[in-house]
Structure formats: C-alpha cells, structure tokens
A protein has these predicted regions:
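Short alpha-helical segments enriched in small residues
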Residues: 1-139
Length: 139
C-alpha cells in the first residue's frame, strides 16, 4: 500500500450501493444512516439506486455535537471524553438511529474531513464507521 489516500469513483460507489440494497432486500431489512463528515452522501448514494424506498428508511445528518445529542441520543459524556470523531461516538450514533427508527440496520460515520480541524491524536482524514443491528454493533 502506498499510504496515499484513495477515492472511490461514481461507478464503484453506485455498484456498492446496489450490493447493499440487494443484501438488505434479500434479508427484508431497512437501513437508516447517521452521518457527520459525509453530510448525507451515504444516504444519497443508497437512494440513487432504483427501488431504494423498499430498503432505505431515513438518514440523519448530525454535523454538530448538539445534533448528535438531540437527534441520536449521543451522550454529552461520550462527546466530552472521546470527542465526536471516535469509536464510542459512532456506536452511539448508530444505536441511536436504530432506536429512533426501529429498523433493522444502521450505519454511522464521523470524521475529520479537513482541510483543518485535525490534531496530533486525530489528524485530518481520521474517520470512524459504526454499524448497528438490534442484537449487536461494531466499528
């Protein structure tokens, strides 16, 4: 690996969204997104797929900590202790979205997109993804 950032092209993103949709449809599940640094791009990619209304429930864009707490029930303590860009926060975001909607799957993302805002501990480009289902959650 070169260590250089990579980007996913539109065709690859669409193919990935189709695959996610196919798997969700096959399971009879619906998904909710809880996004910060992506500002709605995940749910946009998913809803670009025809028929996505059968498996996409909704998407939250919670850019601020206030929105994370208000809309997704992320605790102030988690944000104070770990920050918005952390494993703990994305797990709370995913679980909060799942609880708010009652669907079967949630994805959450929070990161430091740049060009500024990074620190030595969390440089620009740091991103956490979290997934939640009724019986478990992972990052």
């Amino acid at each position: 690996m070169s260590g250089e950032p990579s980007a996913i092209g539109d065709a690859q993103l669409y193919a990935l969204a189709e695959t996610v949709g196919r798997e969700l449809r096959a399971a009879g599940w619906r998904i909710v997104t809880a996004e910060s640094c992506t500002a709605g791009w995940i749910v946009k990619a998913l809803t670009d797929v025809p028929g996505s209304s059968r498996w996409v429930d909704s998407g939250y864009v919670t850019y601020s900590n206030t929105a994370k707490m208000r809309d997704l029930d992320v605790s102030a303590r988690t944000l104070d202790e770990h920050g918005a860009v952390s494993e703990a926060t994305v797990l709370e975001m995913a679980n909060g979205a799942l609880q708010a909607t009652g669907v079967e799957a949630a994805v959450a993302v929070s990161g430091i997109a740049g060009p500024d805002g990074g620190t030595a501990d969390k440089p620009v480009g740091t991103v956490w993804f979290g997934w939640a289902w009724p019986d478990r959650s992972v990052t």
